[in-house]
């Protein structure tokens, strides 16, 4: 029986864990969706995190089961793909396909549809997102983008500095000990010099009482930025901290929707946005947030969710190549986390230079391989309008805290 859609719940054990104040992760938790229409397939991904958008793998799976996909397939069959792509770019995915739901549901469906359209049209990922073409008389942009490196709580500063360079931008995940964090900042600053930005990501772990002394201590140690220092949506307190801290503030968990972006600007709560494809509702909506940041003089980072497993990786990288003025770009660590991946070809980072080059197309440039099969959980047959469980042997799932 042919499948119009096949959903995978990928909870793949990680070779190396990743720890920060909001979560400790030892396995991926992504939903990967394959849509097939008239013999062409596209794959999409989301990576829901309850502490970011309030969504979980279970809630997005349930929302997908409730979402009627008839209009999605009707438009894919009935509208010329180039015209449909232009409508989606102009009006937004949710509007064109009449989909309601959380940001990760929208991301899952949008990335799958964009990948399918890219394959039909022979377009690469950056072209799908409307990336600007070459400007007459301008020098071509460099082929590679530098990426940041993250010092999380599972590795010492000494090992990080010895093994993770060269460094273009360093993010340090905060601990529950501000003195330890300041020591890490001092060690990184001494190693990289003054030309490399250093940011501490507090992941909402500071309080209004501790935020200012913590910020001053990190500033004096050599930090340039602090990311999401206070509980999500602490707009007034963020504005007050920004005025006195002597550090620039980047928002992440507080910045999920266009409404969040507008509030952040009105409250003068930040200097930079952390843009992530899954939490922001897909690459096209993420691009709109980048436009909002530019209009208001706010910097932006292209970030990742920890342990992305497939098309979400290349969607974020495509966004970065469309918006080269990003403060920094995160590449993720799929090469370190997963000896075997569910997609081919696997995403690549040049670890000798810590740079990225664009992924080859069409679409997001990858397909599901045999390693994906055990993670399949639901199928939507062409002959049926309802999802059916997939009966496959399940891999051992390791808890991710």
Residue ranges and their predicted role:
Residues 33, 39, 109, 122, ...:
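Conserved, mostly hydrophobic/aromatic
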Residues 335-401:
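C-terminal extensions of enzymes
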Residues 28-30, 111, 119, 182:
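Conserved N-terminal beta1-alpha1 strand-loop-helix module at the mouth
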Residues 1-54, 335-342, 390-401:
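Structured beta-strand/loop patches that form or line metal/cofactor-binding pockets in enzymes
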Residues 234-240, 244-248, 256-355, 359-363:
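Shared catalytic-loop signature of beta/alpha-barrel
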């Amino acid at each position: 029986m042919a499948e119009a859609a096949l959903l995978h719940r990928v909870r793949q054990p990680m070779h190396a864990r990743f720890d920060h104040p909001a979560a400790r992760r030892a396995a991926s938790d992504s939903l990967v969706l394959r849509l097939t229409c008239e013999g062409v397939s596209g794959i999409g991904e989301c990576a829901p995190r309850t502490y970011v958008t309030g969504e979980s793998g279970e809630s997005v799976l349930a929302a997908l089961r409730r979402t009627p996909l008839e209009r999605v397939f009707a438009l894919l069959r009935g509208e010329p793909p180039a015209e449909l792509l232009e409508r989606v770019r102009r009006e937004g995915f949710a509007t064109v396909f009449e989909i309601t739901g959380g940001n990760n549901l929208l991301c899952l469906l949008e990335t799958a549809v964009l990948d399918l359209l890219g394959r039909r049209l022979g377009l690469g990922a950056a072209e799908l997102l409307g990336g600007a073409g070459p400007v007459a008389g301008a020098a071509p942009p460099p082929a590679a983008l530098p990426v940041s490196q993250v010092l999380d709580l599972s590795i010492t500063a000494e090992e990080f500095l010895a093994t993770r360079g060269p460094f273009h931008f360093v993010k340090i995940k905060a601990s529950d000990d501000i003195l330890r964090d300041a020591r890490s900042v001092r060690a990184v600053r001494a190693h990289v010099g003054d030309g490399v930005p250093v940011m501490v990501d507090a992941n909402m772990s500071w309080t209004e009482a501790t935020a200012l002394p913590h910020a001053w201590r990190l500033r004096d140690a050599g930090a340039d930025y602090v990311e999401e220092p206070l509980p999500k949506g602490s707009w007034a307190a963020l504005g007050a901290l920004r005025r006195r801290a002597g550090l620039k503030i980047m928002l992440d968990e507080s910045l999920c929707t266009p409404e969040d972006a507008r509030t952040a600007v009105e409250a003068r709560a930040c200097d930079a946005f952390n843009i992530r494809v899954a939490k922001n509702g897909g690459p096209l909506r993420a691009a709109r947030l980048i436009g909002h940041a530019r209009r208001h003089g706010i910097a932006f980072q292209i970030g990742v969710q920890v342990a992305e497993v497939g098309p979400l990786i290349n969607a974020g990288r495509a966004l970065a190549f469309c918006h080269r003025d990003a403060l920094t770009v995160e590449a993720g660590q799929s090469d370190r986390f997963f000896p075997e991946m569910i997609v081919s070809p696997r995403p690549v980072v040049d670890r000798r230079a810590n740079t990225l080059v664009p992924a080859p197309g069409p679409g997001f440039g990858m397909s599901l391989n045999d390693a994906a099969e055990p993670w399949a959980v639901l199928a939507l047959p062409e002959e049926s309008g309802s999802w059916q469980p997939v009966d496959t042997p399940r891999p051992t799932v390791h808890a991710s805290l």
